Each structure stands twice: as C-alpha cells, then as structure tokens.
C-alpha cells in the first residue's frame, strides 16, 4: 500500500545520531492534509486519493474549486495532488491525513519543483567541458558541433543552451529521520527538490525499503 502526504519545505538543518554522527536533514512542514476525492476503478478507470494542502484565499478561488472543496467539508486548497496505489477504501472524503502515517527509518520518495536557473549554457546545464582558453582558441564555452553534415538538421535531444530548472523532480529512497507529530514536521535525511516554502509530495518509496 502506498502512503502519501503533501507538505511545505521549510529549510535544512542538522541532527546528531546516538553515536555522534552528524546527519543533514530537510525540514518539511506537513499540516493535516484533507482527502478531497476518492478516484475509483469504476468511475475513473484507476484508483487514487486526491488530497489537498494549505488553504487558498477565497478571493483567488473559482466556483468549481469552492464546490469541490465543499463536498469534502473543507476550504479550497492551494496544493492538490493524487496518491496512486493508496488503499482507497481505508479513507473517507473529508478525512485528515497527518504525519504520523510515516515513522523513523522509513524510505520515501519526494517530488517537488526544482529551483529555476533561467537560460543557461551547456557547461552549467549539462556539465560539459569548456574549450581551451589560450593559444588562439576561439572555442571557450560554446556548445560545439551540432552534428555531421549528412542529415542536414540537428537531431532532437541535442544538448544545447536553454531554460534550466523549474521542472518536476523526484528523489527516491530518502530516509525519514524523525517525525514530530506535535508540530506536524517531517525530518528527511539529505536534500529535497525546490526552494524554501515550495510544495512537495511525499510518498512511500517505489523501490521499497
């Protein structure tokens, strides 16, 4: 069964284990999520739980969002995602999901939106090596050859300069170091995608513990 919760990235700090090892952790604030809808095989063709996190201002909410949230008896949410593989029958619409569904030592996958870097060249974007800087070289940070003459075109997927970051990224098999049920916090070993205050989705590890 897949478990999942939505949260907000607060930042990073560090903890010390019982044997004195320093552990870098990311703090995720996961206030109680609300089940907005249950997707079923009969009605939707697949099973999933639709959950919401963080109340949305009424002035920024449209009629459809208000009606959808009212069915669950809650306020419209800013961040709404689906958790596939969840035990749908174990939940009811309007039910709250809290951080206590996870425990220390559990392996999880974290999905977020990476930091936007704007338009970047091939060295920063793809990690390519730069050219010589002296001896008459005119090639320093350019992308290099586009390909051979014969096709008369540039193949799709050619690594070139362009927009970098601001895309969905999932990091797998991260470890839950600690769960604070009083403050609704999850402490996750290592870093997770996104800037501070960005939203993330935390699910059970696909590749298992």
UniProtKB/Swiss-Prot annotation:
Keyword Zinc-finger applies: no
Protein name, as recorded: Large ribosomal subunit protein uL3
Similarity field: Belongs to the universal ribosomal protein uL3 family.
Subunit structure of this chain's protein: Part of the 50S ribosomal subunit. Forms a cluster with proteins L14 and L19.
GO terms for MF: rRNA binding; structural constituent of ribosome
HAMAP family from the UniProt entry: Ribosomal_uL3_B
One of the GO biological process terms: translation
Biological classification of the source: Bacteria, Bacillati, Bacillota, Bacilli, Bacillales
Gene Ontology CC, one term: cytosolic large ribosomal subunit
Summary of the function given for this chain in its UniProt record: One of the primary rRNA binding proteins, it binds directly near the 3'-end of the 23S rRNA, where it nucleates assembly of the 50S subunit.
Keyword ATP-binding in record: no
Gene: rplC
Disulfide bond positions: none
The entry's keywords: Ribonucleoprotein, Ribosomal protein, RNA-binding, rRNA-binding
Database matches in InterPro entries: Ribosomal_uL3 (IPR000597), Ribosomal_uL3_bac/org-type (IPR019927), Ribosomal_uL3_CS (IPR019926), Transl_B-barrel_sf (IPR009000)
Pfam families: Ribosomal_L3
């Amino acid at each position: 069964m897949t478990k999942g919760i939505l949260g907000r990235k607060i930042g990073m700090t560090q903890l010390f284990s019982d044997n004195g090892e320093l552990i870098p952790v990311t703090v995720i604030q996961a206030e109680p999520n609300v089940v907005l809808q249950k997707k079923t095989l009969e009605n939707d063709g697949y099973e999933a739980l639709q959950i919401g996190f963080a109340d949305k201002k009424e002035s920024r909410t449209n009629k459809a969002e208000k009606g959808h949230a009212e069915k669950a008896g809650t306020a419209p949410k800013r961040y709404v995602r689906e958790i596939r593989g969840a035990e749908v029958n174990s939940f009811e619409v309007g039910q709250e999901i809290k951080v206590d569904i996870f425990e220390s030592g559990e392996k999880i996958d974290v999905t977020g939106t990476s930091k936007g870097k704007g338009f970047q060249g091939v060295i920063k974007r793809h990690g390519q090596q730069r050219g010589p800087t002296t001896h008459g070289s005119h090639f320093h940070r350019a992308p290099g050859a586009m390909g051979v003459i014969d096709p008369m075109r540039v193949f799709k997927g050619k690594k070139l300069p362009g927009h970098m970051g601001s895309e969905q990224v999932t990091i797998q098999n991260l470890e839950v170091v600690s769960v604070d049920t009083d403050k609704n916090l999850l402490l996750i070993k290592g870093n997770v995608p996104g800037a501070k205050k960005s939203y993330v989705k935390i699910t059970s590890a696909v590749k298992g513990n």
